[in-house]
């Protein structure tokens, strides 16, 4: 239903990019940020319920993705530019403030937007990726040695794009399956059993069937979106991970003061990256409304458990209204 239903897209100019943004509904502004490798379509089950609940919903393809522009330089995707894009959507739509919900890489952008734009971003919710001040350990975890780790692999220029652009459908299915609820929990982490010399598609298991959460039509739409620019723009996001701290020294030790919430699937392998992931929420968020773990979901909770995820989003938005 998500594809066949005609969405209202607007093209929004930001500093250095043109974003294609689904904009629907009337009311307070809520911006939804996808991550890697995704596009606006990740939120296909959430848009209508949020509109029905009385919100204006803006869902961009973030820069480098889908119908948005794909700037050429690695530095075009640094954290300052990614967060500025979000506030530029607010300004273009004529709002003073907005509420923000991110998923995966969209969480890193959301947490940092909340810190850098605290006067316009009034509430922030993350799905899947906890609040982390990214350090070199994200790229080179201690003890990694010569084992494969996707974030380190993604730092290599051209190699990654060549591998993933060769067969876009296979690349997407491998990622969706490896992090999804159809593969056993921990599947994503099996990449660490492979040597650093292989590519991502060799380090992850061949994808099995995807459940009803990603139909053949869904997959075809994703392939169409990624065929526009390939994986260069999306992978450039990862090439900016090492620079986040240097570009935001004023955020060192700063935690989120706005109302905030976090939810993740119980089987999301991202939570295995850091057994201590709850600590920043418990230690430093000034107004954490809730932290929920959804059974039966892995990484793609918006589509694996759409009704439950939407309910958590609406619960948060209604609490902070």
Q: How would you describe each model-predicted region?
A:
Residues 14-23:
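A short loop-to-beta-strand scaffold at the N-terminal edge of the catalytic core in hydrolase folds
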Residues 1-12, 319-321:
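Basic/polar N-terminal segments that are highly enriched at the extreme N-terminus
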Residues 22-69, 281:
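Conserved HGGG/HGGXW glycine-rich cap/lid loop of the alpha/beta-hydrolase fold
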Residues 9-11, 57-59, 290-293:
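Conserved beta-strand scaffold positions in the cores of enzyme catalytic domains, especially
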Residues 36, 40-43, 105, 111, ...:
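Signature tryptophan residues that serve as conserved aromatic anchors
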Residues 3-8, 18, 29, 65-101, ...:
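Flexible "cap/lid" subdomain of the alpha/beta-hydrolase fold that forms the substrate-access gate
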Residues 46, 113, 312-316:
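Hydrophobic residues on the short alpha-helix immediately C-terminal to a glycine-rich phosphate/catalytic loop
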Residues 288-321:
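Catalytic active-site module of serine/aspartate enzymes centered on a nucleophile-bearing elbow/loop
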């Amino acid at each position: 239903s998500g594809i066949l239903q005609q969405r209202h897209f607007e093209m929004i100019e930001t500093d250095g990019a043109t974003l294609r943004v689904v904009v629907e509904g009337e009311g307070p502004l809520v911006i939804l940020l996808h991550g890697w490798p995704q596009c606006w379509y990740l939120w296909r089950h959430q848009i209508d319920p949020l509109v029905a609940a009385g919100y204006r919903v803006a869902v961009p393809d973030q820069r480098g993705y889908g119908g948005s522009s794909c700037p050429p330089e690695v530095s075009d995707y640094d954290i300052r530019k990614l967060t500025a894009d979000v506030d530029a959507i607010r300004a273009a739509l004529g709002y003073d403030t907005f509420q923000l919900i991110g998923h995966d890489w969209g969480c890193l952008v959301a947490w940092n937007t909340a810190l850098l734009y605290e006067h316009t971003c009034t509430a922030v919710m993350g799905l899947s990726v906890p609040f982390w001040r990214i350090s070199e350990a994200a790229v080179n975890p201690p003890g990694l040695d010569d084992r494969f780790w996707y974030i380190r692999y993604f730092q290599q220029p051209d190699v990654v794009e060549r591998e993933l652009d060769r067969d876009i459908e296979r690349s997407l299915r491998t990622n969706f399956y490896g992090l999804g609820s159809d593969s056993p929990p921990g599947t994503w982490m099996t990449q660490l059993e492979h040597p650093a010399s292989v590519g991502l598609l060799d380090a992850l298991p061949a994808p099995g069937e995807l459940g009803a959460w990603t139909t053949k039509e869904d997959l075809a739409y994703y392939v169409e979106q990624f065929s526009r620019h390939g994986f260069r723009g999306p992978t450039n996001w990862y090439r900016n991970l090492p620079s986040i701290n240097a570009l935001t020294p004023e955020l060192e030790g700063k935690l989120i003061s706005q109302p905030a919430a976090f939810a993740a699937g119980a089987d999301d392998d991202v939570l295995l990256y850091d057994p201590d992931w709850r600590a920043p929420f418990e230690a430093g968020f000034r107004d954490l409304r809730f932290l929920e773990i959804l059974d039966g979901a892995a990484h793609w909770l918006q589509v694996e458990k759409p009704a439950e995820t939407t309910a958590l989003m609406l619960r948060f938005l209604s609490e902070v209204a």
